[in-house]
Amino acid sequence: MNKQELLHMIKQSNRKRLLQRLFLAIPAALAVYFLIRTDGNIWVGFAIIGGVLLATRYFLSHEADAISRLSEQDQVKRVVTLQYHLDFLFITLLALVNPLAIRIMEWSWIPAVLIGGALLYILWAQEKLDQQIRWLDPEQPTRREIRRF
């Protein structure tokens, strides 16, 4: 299969999972609300966000497995898996650390700087990993190409 056929196949698969991802957004927003609220019980937010993070981890690992199967090289498979681990790390950072930092430091700019710095670092790391994939296997679709297609 050439790169365009692989991209088309990935896009069809992502459309099937879109509804599942949208259903995760509602409990995630509710959990962040409970984590930020200073007068409520924080454990409700932890329970909800824990379930959302487990489901997100399942979906991301399933997607990483599907995309890494497109290449026969072990190094490419490791890089693809690492990219999805970074995505999960950033989602966890957004879901747990940021609301708790906002809860503790209500009127501070520190949580925004932490999240902004983490976002820039992860975007930089993703770009470097995409470059490595292009170098290892030119026919393997990169994350950027998958998002654009």
Regions found by a protein language model. Name each.
Residues 104-132:
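Hydrophobic alpha-helical transmembrane segments and immediately flanking/interface helices
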Residues 132-149:
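Short, highly charged, low-complexity non-transmembrane loops/tails of multi-pass membrane proteins
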Residues 77-102, 117-122:
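Hydrophobic alpha-helical membrane segments
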Residues 32-40, 97-106:
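Juxtamembrane "helix-exit" motif on the non-cytosolic side of transmembrane helices
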Residues 43-54, 92-98, 108-119:
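Hydrophobic core segments of alpha-helical transmembrane domains in multi-pass membrane proteins
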Residues 1-63:
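N-terminal first transmembrane alpha-helix
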